[in-house]
């Protein structure tokens, strides 16, 4: 079974800016096992590689400039899973297989790879509970305040796609993904297994918008880390796309920061957890489904108020 995203490979135009961004974002710089690249990891061990955008080892890009070039998904039963994937994907563009992996190109042009999962569960990473009416989960303890974010895991990726129907069908029929919710003719929220968080992949169709990366999202521990991470990025002089805020469609709290690696990077937490019994909702795309509330441009670390336009 596919378990989630474990490796992202980016081709970038500015290595120095990309390295600073990932360090400020709270990812851990470690010695890369791929020559000529930089490697950062989340707390559970997921990997983000930085290549030069013209590195011949990278797959073809789906858009110009700095962007995501390859997504690797983990498998919890690699022997059976690889055999099943090989059977399902053997007629797909870019198909390759070895004893350890299967790879192809999805209908959106993105290279996707599947291999044995290597990320670690982190049961020791706990946070203080939320006190709500009728449910007391924190006693004689204060909620935490975070100086910066330290992402736990890669949560999901979001791509612009000019052919939503074809790409959605590929992930559901070829890879066994589940539809969680949808914007009619506009977007599909997909999770890679029946029981799991709201989405591992979101496909977004906008008229006349070609294939490209919208954002990459990283799980943090709680809403307080969303805020602490975003404030630190403001303090480190990175611009906010939008956030903090909350998505009603998934219940998640978010903060998106513009990234020199392409698209935006998102801190998020509190997304819905679904099972096979969940019935997908198909809604017309509406602003109030994307944001219950949100702050455009972020919060200023000094004033703790909305960033004022220049």
Please provide the spans of the model-predicted regions.
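Minor-groove-contacting beta-hairpin "wing" of winged helix-turn-helix DNA-binding domains
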Residues: 36-41, 188-190
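Glyoxalase I/VOC metalloenzyme domain signal
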Residues: 1-31, 42-99, 105-155, 159-184, ...
């Amino acid at each position: 079974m596919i378990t989630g995203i474990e490796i992202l490979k980016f081709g970038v135009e500015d290595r120095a800016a990309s390295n600073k961004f990932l360090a400020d974002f709270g990812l851990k710089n470690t010695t890369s096992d791929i020559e000529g690249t930089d490697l950062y990891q989340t707390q559970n061990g997921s990997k983000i590689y930085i290549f030069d955008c013209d590195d011949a080892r990278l797959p073809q890009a789906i858009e110009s400039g700095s962007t995501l070039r390859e997504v690797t998904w983990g498998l919890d039963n690699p022997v059976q899973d690889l055999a099943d994937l090989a059977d399902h994907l053997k007629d797909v563009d870019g198909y390759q297989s070895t004893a350890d992996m299967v790879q192809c190109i999805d209908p959106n042009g993105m290279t996707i790879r599947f291999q044995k999962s290597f990320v670690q569960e982190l049961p020791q990473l706990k946070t203080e509970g939320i006190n709500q009416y009728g449910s007391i989960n924190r006693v004689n303890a204060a909620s935490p305040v975070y100086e910066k974010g330290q992402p736990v895991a890669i949560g999901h990726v979001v791509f612009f796609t000019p052919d939503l129907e074809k790409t959605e069908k590929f992930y559901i029929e070829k890879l066994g993904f589940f539809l969680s919710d949808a914007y009619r003719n506009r977007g599909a929220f997909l999770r890679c297994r029946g029981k799991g968080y709201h989405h591992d992949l979101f496909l977004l169709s906008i008229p006349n918008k070609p294939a490209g990366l919208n954002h990459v999202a990283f799980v943090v521990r709680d809403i307080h880390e969303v805020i602490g991470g975003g404030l630190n990025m403001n303090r480190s002089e990175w611009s906010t796309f939008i956030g903090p805020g909350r998505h009603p469609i998934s219940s998640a709290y978010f903060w998106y920061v513009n990234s020199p690696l392409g698209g935006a990077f998102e801190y998020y937490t509190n997304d819905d957890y679904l099972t096979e019994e969940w019935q997908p909702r198909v809604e017309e795309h509406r602003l109030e489904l994307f944001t219950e509330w949100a702050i455009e441009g972020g919060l200023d670390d000094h004033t703790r108020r909305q960033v004022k336009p220049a």
